[in-house]
């Protein structure tokens, strides 16, 4: 095995012309993408539009494809005649300058996220249509989709009416010492070899400030699953999740959608299953290497398989 250090990775990346590589891929897989970038529902007032949505979104796509993390860094790196000409040539338009990052940020802030989702969906459908993802099916059947939530940002004061809220209390007095307002997103990521890409997204957020029960990851999963099912009704899905997902609502959604699931198990999450496994693993457990598994564990009228590694 060749160990890749970060430095050698960076050196190697320098040799790649990401722009050309992206254009090659785009021509082969996503012929229609330029049109789609142009057709997004532009939230801006027509009289203020200096750069088309295609120029802005394409610049951002290139930023990400080139592994540039900040907008200001992008402008610094892209604002060269050659680069501007390349982008203009690809999009078939006249360009003297690239949009300022404030212009890009303002546009992205006002754009409905669904407009970006439509472009992502188009790209994923093209990959399925061209059968480019066939070799990544588990047991030649299911595509693994990992679900997990991640924090987006947090604030010490309320930032909007949809914020989730967490109060930290003093253990002795019970007084609230600190309140944190935060936003989270639940992502469904398709696993393709050693890469993953986002296939569906659901924000975890409250409807308003006065909700009696806050939104949570499992509720967001219910919405995410409905979205995924609507977008790809016949996709053979295998859900991968951490131990939080080992619960009846998730099992129920998966069975009714004909999805398989592979979920990490923690003893505390479903005690009856843990008890049964521990009671019979010495007698009926099958072993291979360091792993022991039991095929038929009954839980809420369903049968689960538990593997201990
Ligand atoms: Zn907020």
PLM regions with names:
Residues 23, 27-99, 105:
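Gly/serine-rich nucleotide phosphate-binding loop at the start of the catalytic core
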Residues 59, 74-75, 100, 104, ...:
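Short, conserved catalytic/metal-binding motifs centered on acidic residues
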Residues 105-195:
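Active-site-proximal, Lys/Arg-enriched surface segment
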Residues 149, 190-192, 203-205, 243, ...:
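Short, structured patches in soluble enzyme cores that scaffold and shape functional sites
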Residues 169-235:
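Electropositive, glycine- and tryptophan-enriched low-complexity nucleic-acid-binding patches
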């Amino acid at each position: 095995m060749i160990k890749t250090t970060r430095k050698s990775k960076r050196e190697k990346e320098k040799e790649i012309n990401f722009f050309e590589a992206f254009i090659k891929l785009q021509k082969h897989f996503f012929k229609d993408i330029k049109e789609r970038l142009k057709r997004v529902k532009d939230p801006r007032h027509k009289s203020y539009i200096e750069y088309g949505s295609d120029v802005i979104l394409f610049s951002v796509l290139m930023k990400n494809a080139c592994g540039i993390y900040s907008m200001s860094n992008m402008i610094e790196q892209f604002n060269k005649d050659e680069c501007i000409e390349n982008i203009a040539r690809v999009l078939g338009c006249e360009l003297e300058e690239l949009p300022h990052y404030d212009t890009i940020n303002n546009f992205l802030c006002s754009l409905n996220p669904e407009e970006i989702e439509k472009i992502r969906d188009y790209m994923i459908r093209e990959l399925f249509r061209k059968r480019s993802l066939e070799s990544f099916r588990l047991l030649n059947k299911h595509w693994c989709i990992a679900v997990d939530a991640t924090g987006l940002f947090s604030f010490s004061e309320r930032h909007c009416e949809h914020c989730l809220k967490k109060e930290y209390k003093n253990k002795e007095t019970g007084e609230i010492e600190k309140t944190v307002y935060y936003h989270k997103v639940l992502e469904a990521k398709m696993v393709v070899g050693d890469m993953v890409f986002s296939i569906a997204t659901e924000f975890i957020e409250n409807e308003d400030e006065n909700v009696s029960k806050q939104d949570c990851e499992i509720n967001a999963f219910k919405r995410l699953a409905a979205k995924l099912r609507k977008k790809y009704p016949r996709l053979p899905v295998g859900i991968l999740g951490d131990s939080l997902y080992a619960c009846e609502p998730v099992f129920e959604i998966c069975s009714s959608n004909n999805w398989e699931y592979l979920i990490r198990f923690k003893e505390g999450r479903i005690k009856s299953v843990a008890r049964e496994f521990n009671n019979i693993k010495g007698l009926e457990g099958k072993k291979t290497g360091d792993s022991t598994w039991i095929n038929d564990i009954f839980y809420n009228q369903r049968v689960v398989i538990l593997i201990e590694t």
